[in-house]
Amino acid sequence: MYNAEKKQPTYWQRLKIAFQYVMPQLYLTLAAGWLAKQKWGSVTHFIIKLFAKKYRVNMQEAEKTEFKDYASFNEFFIRPLKADARKIDENPTALCLPADGRISQYGHIEQQTLLQAKGHSFSLVDLLAGDTELAKEFEHGEFATIYLSPRDYHRVHMPCDATLRKMIYVPGDLFSVNPFLNEHIPNLLARNERVICVFDTEFGTMVQILVGATITASMSTVWAGIINPPRSAEVKEWTYSGESAVQLRKGQEMGAFQLGSTVINLFQADKVELANHLDVGVPVRVGEVLAYKK
């Protein structure tokens, strides 16, 4: 696990942090969601082109490489990739990374505490919406957090074959989750809106969490569709068994963000060993090795 001495923010950085607390997070997010759905023809194509240029989006790996082929910004943002754009590691003892992005944090869960960033830890119980029994399953386990920037591919995939046990929607804040704010806003990942997916796998119980953020207009899964909006003020839980059981294969798409955010994976103690090439800030891609079976 990575941890280093935390630098004090500058005056302008403190203003940036303060703005996160006072800005109308929900209204900005709703407005962004509405705008991203609009189909304005050449205006939409121009906006997409500007965005792709600013963030250096690699359009050659997308199924549709031309900006004019996207009717809305949302359609562009969750663009599928060509079939050969991501290679899924075929080693049966390996779990794969679920998303493109950068490693934000990773390592050992100390009892029921995860490292968020330099100088900040947060409670596993808080992250799991107060579910103490579920949290106990991951005491002394392993975790990995991936930050998806605006330029990244925003569909989320499965690290391994799995059976969905339950899904939990947790209402919360909509702070930005970029690396700077992740370092300076306490408990950020346990405060933000999120969708918790609990899976049974040959590697033990695995949790994969989609964390929302400012202007993340919606999160979706392949089995339930769009989870939010509408946004609930209460925690919601769905269980899956029998006829409603959901089976997913390694590398299969399981969800998506409409605008960027964060994915967190949790593994039980003594079940997996995180790959030694992982490091904070390192860019990663879907299908690369995340961990190996112990």
UniProtKB/Swiss-Prot annotation:
It catalyses: a 1,2-diacyl-sn-glycero-3-phospho-L-serine + H(+) = a 1,2-diacyl-sn-glycero-3-phosphoethanolamine + CO2. The record marks 260-261 as: Cleavage (non-hydrolytic). Keywords: Cell membrane, Decarboxylase, Lipid biosynthesis, Lipid metabolism, Lyase, Membrane, Phospholipid biosynthesis, Phospholipid metabolism, Pyruvate, Zymogen. The active site is at residues 100, 157, 261. It is found in: Cell membrane. Its cofactor is pyruvate. One of its GO terms (cellular component) is plasma membrane. Binds 1 pyruvoyl group covalently per subunit. One of its GO terms (molecular function) is phosphatidylserine decarboxylase activity. It holds the Pfam family PS_Dcarbxylase. Is synthesized initially as an inactive proenzyme. Formation of the active enzyme involves a self-maturation process in which the active site pyruvoyl group is generated from an internal serine residue via an autocatalytic post-translational modification. Two non-identical subunits are generated from the proenzyme in this reaction, and the pyruvate is formed at the N-terminus of the alpha chain, which is derived from the carboxyl end of the proenzyme. GO terms for biological process: phosphatidylethanolamine biosynthetic process. Pathway: Phospholipid metabolism; phosphatidylethanolamine biosynthesis; phosphatidylethanolamine from CDP-diacylglycerol: step 2/2. The modification Pyruvic acid (Ser) is found at residue 261. The keyword DNA-binding does not apply. It comes from the Bacteria. It is a peripheral membrane protein. It is an enzyme of class 4 (lyase). Its main location: membrane. Catalyzes the formation of phosphatidylethanolamine (PtdEtn) from phosphatidylserine (PtdSer). Belongs to the phosphatidylserine decarboxylase family. PSD-B subfamily. Prokaryotic type I sub-subfamily. This is Phosphatidylserine decarboxylase proenzyme. It comes from Histophilus somni (strain 129Pt).
